């Protein structure tokens, strides 16, 4: 179950914030994010969260845009073509990462301590549905469950 949720989280984030999404293109085009924008899914015993970060001239506008897009996905769903592209891309990235001895070792160790088998991602991946990713986005990316931290340069 932990591995499944991690995979759903990764796919959900790629569909919401990935660099091939309309939201990313809009935010980048408006200069609200730059190429240093990042996002990820983290989980630990008893807690899991989605995170996004980077430099922005208006972090509040980025947060609002993410809320708005998450709400839209909750109402309308993820575009089917985007879902297929993201799913293939994420799977390909996971398979490519197996070429890295470090990634393989760290992944297996983390999975062992989390109670699952690292290489089971291949078996589970095809069973993950668009509806699961849509549900995660709709439930997790709401005002009551988000926080914004802004770090400003020290005045000189």
Where is each model-derived feature located?
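His/Glu-based metal-binding/catalytic segments typifying zinc-dependent metallopeptidases
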Residues: 1-22, 26
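Generic solvent-exposed, charged/amphipathic alpha-helical segments
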Residues: 9-13, 24, 67, 130, ...
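Histidine kinase transmitter module recognition
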Residues: 15, 93-97, 140
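M16 family metallopeptidases and their MPP-like homologs
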Residues: 24-75, 80-128, 145-152
């Amino acid at each position: 179950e932990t591995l499944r949720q991690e995979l759903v989280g990764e796919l959900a984030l790629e569909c919401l914030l990935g660099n091939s999404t309309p939201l990313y293109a809009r935010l980048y085009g408006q200069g609200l994010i730059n190429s240093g924008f990042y996002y990820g899914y983290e989980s630990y015993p008893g807690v899991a969260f989605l995170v996004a970060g980077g430099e922005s001239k208006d972090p509040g506008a980025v947060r609002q845009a993410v809320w708005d897009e998450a709400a839209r996905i909750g109402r309308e769903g993820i575009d089917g073509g985007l879902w297929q592209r993201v799913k293939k891309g994420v799977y390909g990235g996971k398979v490519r990462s197996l070429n890295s001895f470090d990634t393989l070792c760290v992944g297996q160790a983390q999975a062992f301590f989390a109670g699952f088998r690292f290489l089971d991602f291949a078996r589970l991946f095809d069973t993950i549905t668009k509806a699961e990713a849509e549900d995660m986005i709709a439930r997790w990316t709401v005002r009551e469950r988000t926080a914004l931290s802004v770090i400003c340069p020290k005045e000189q």
